[in-house]
Amino acid sequence: MGSLFRSFRRDAGATAPSVGATPAKKEPPPPPMTPLEKMLQDMGAIREDGSDKFFGMENYGNTCYCNSILQCLYYSVPFREAVINYPTRTPIESLTAALAETLRYPNPNAHLEAEAQAEKQKAANAQRPGAPPNQPQKPEDKDSPEYKKKMALQTFPLLETKNNAPSYGMSESLFTSLKDLFESVVGSQSRIGIVRPQHFLDVLRREHEMFRTAMHQDAHEFLNLLLNEVVANVEAEALKQPSLERSLPPAESSESVEHSGSSGSKTPNTTRWVHELFEGTLTSETQCLTCEKVSQRDEVFLDLSVDLEQHSSVTSCLRKFSAEEMLCERNKFHCDNCGGLQEAEKRMKIKRLPRILALHLKRFKYTEDLQRLQKLFHRVVYPYHLRLFNTTDDAEDPDRLYELYAVVVHIGGGPYHGHYVAIIKTQDRGWLLFDDEMVEPVDKNYVRNFFGDKPGLACAYVLFYQETTLEAVLREQEQENMDPALATTETNDSLKQNGFAQSPALGLVHSASQIPSHDEPHRLNSLKRAPTAPSLPTHYEHTDTNSAPSIPKPAMAPPVPPIPETHSMPLSPKKSDLQSRKERAKEEKERKAAEKERERQRRKEQEATRKEQEARARENQRREDAELKAALEASRASKADEDRRNQEGQKDRDPGRSGHGLSRLKRGSKSFSHRLSKDKDTRVPSSSNPGVPDPNSPPLNNTVVTSEHQEQEQQPPSDQQPGASRLSKKHNLNDEERDANKDPKQDKPGHGKWRSFSLRKKSLGILS
């Protein structure tokens, strides 16, 4: 028994650590696998073309515009092959030797050291005299993009590029730095990592002053500049090499051509590969409406910029791009056939289609009221496959089919700030999200979340389409529909910790976003340094829950990302509330500044409108005064004319006219005597004459004429009637009345009135 206890004590002493000895350290747990690492677990050997490399790019402060465009160009297979093969392809042995110096593997325990440092910092902050006691500290969200980027920098291989232009036989330029970048990724023995494009940025800032500042830059402008710089550098180097090409033997030259053709480039020294990939030809057709002659003018393009309309699509935008435009008024067309300015119709059509079509959606528009650029959040739908219809009749391959392979997304409220990310379709692994240092797989439907109508500030800005065939499209669709259950399982496994395509998680995040005091500040705060799409797309995917019926809901478990996001707020309410108040105060300040600016512009417009109305009122008043003055002048002139006519009427009634009347009476007396000779047998006393008017009653013209005519027929001869002289005068007046009845001037207004009045007056005078 004693020996048994001694052996047990001896064994216990051997196993128990001594007092002065240090305990053995446990192996540190490996860092958790990222969704990208899980996706690449079943991949085979590394390829030599670099199509299976998925490297992020470090952001040096507002360089996301450069990272997103470089990623899109790298995953364009023909462009990557052309860059690597010009002027010659660097041997893989040389690349491996160079990468041995530039590729650096970080400490695998760096994440543990970072966590320990964070704990020490937290303890130091708690021991400060000014720190409030027992204040809960907000734990770091391990599913946030910022944390993932930080961990990627600490755990992934870091690849730095150096100037290898002498090995290419070229001088250092933007093209050689781009070639260094692509060759470093292709020659790396690791599938994942982070590239440091510091050398590329140094060359870019050295040659172009506009990129030397840390200001927010435009990704489309950088794309256009980069393509033009590559063309210029390649053509400049080609001019230096004709003597070298002529010195090469014909056999060696043909051998180099065949080798380059097998590696993906047409010739090692060709300078047209950028034009063949990105360049297209636009034809401007102008038809004169006078002579109907059509004139054409061709121009090349490296990308197409299209205007946007609300609730439209890329197809409708292209249709508007090629719509007929009327050239009239001040914008008339000078027709050479007519020899002058004429009205015309103008339209733009595509004559030669590029192999890679870069579509720039013009999201930024200058507004007159704000006097600055403003972002348009219009809904513009872009398809996975596109066929252009606005081509000329003689276009080369007008039925070319394109497939979408990359989307550059702008996240932000305006053109002067924000963030760029790229969503790219890889050759074998589907769609990936490239957000600076972070690379994560996403679902195919995730690409549809940036039409511009979803909540948030993320919108598609540049679309990259590459040529494809109908057979390839059908083969891809068959592959997608071949085994939906297997595809669903793989998607759930690879995206379990990503949170992009999980409908239940999106519902949780979407419900949390309804709280304005927490979600809105976090969403706006993500734009400060490097806002990414993982938090924003969760809002977008919520509306696309029904768009993926192939994923069964029971097989999808709630992912990890939304859990810390929903529970992190109540863990540290004071700190989060303080941060929220600061952000809300900043947002309120910006909003008030914008409101003041809008109010100032509104007052300015109102003042301009008021001045315009006053000027218009003064002009109307002057016009009315002029019209009134003209009316008064016309009235005075008419009054003078009326007075002159009255005076002439008075002259007609003066004694001078009576003489004229007597002469007329004399002529009438002759006719009266002539009538008396015919009516000798007719004798009627004057007292019985019914035609004598009553002096007390005003006679009418017709009455006077009728009565006097009867009297004229019944009047006895002048030698038997004592008042023959009076009757003679009276019959002379009757002759005047008959002449007046025959005169057409009697129907004129005013003329007959005065004559009837004079006849009545004279008749009464004779009777009296």
Swiss-Prot record:
EC numbers on record: 3.4.19.12
Cited PANTHER family: RE52890P (PTHR24006:SF733), UBIQUITIN CARBOXYL-TERMINAL HYDROLASE (PTHR24006)
Gene Ontology cellular-component terms listed: cytosol; nucleus
EC primary class: hydrolase
Biased composition (Basic residues): 663-675, 751-768
Organism: Aspergillus terreus (strain NIH 2624 / FGSC A1156)
Family per record: Belongs to the peptidase C19 family.
Positions of transmembrane segments: none
Catalytic-site annotation from UniProt: C64 (nucleophile), H419 (proton acceptor)
UniProt feature, compositional bias: Pro residues: 551-564
Domain USP span(s) in chain numbering: 55-468
Record keyword Disulfide bond present: no
Coiled coil spans: 574-633
Superkingdom of origin: Eukaryota
GO terms of biological process kind: carbon catabolite repression of transcription; protein deubiquitination; ubiquitin-dependent protein catabolic process
Any one Gene Ontology molecular-function term assigned to this protein's record: cysteine-type deubiquitinase activity
Pfam families named in the record: UCH
Gene from which this protein is expressed: creB
Region (Disordered): 1-33, 114-146, 242-270, 515-768
Protein's name according to its UniProt entry: Probable ubiquitin carboxyl-terminal hydrolase creB
Compositionally biased residues, Basic and acidic residues: 574-657, 732-750
Keywords, comma-separated and alphabetical: Coiled coil, Hydrolase, Protease, Thiol protease, Ubl conjugation pathway
Function of the molecule: Ubiquitin thioesterase component of the regulatory network controlling carbon source utilization through ubiquitination and deubiquitination involving creA, creB, creC, creD and acrB. Deubiquitinates the creA catabolic repressor and the quinate permease qutD. Also plays a role in response to carbon starvation and the control of extracellular proteases activity.
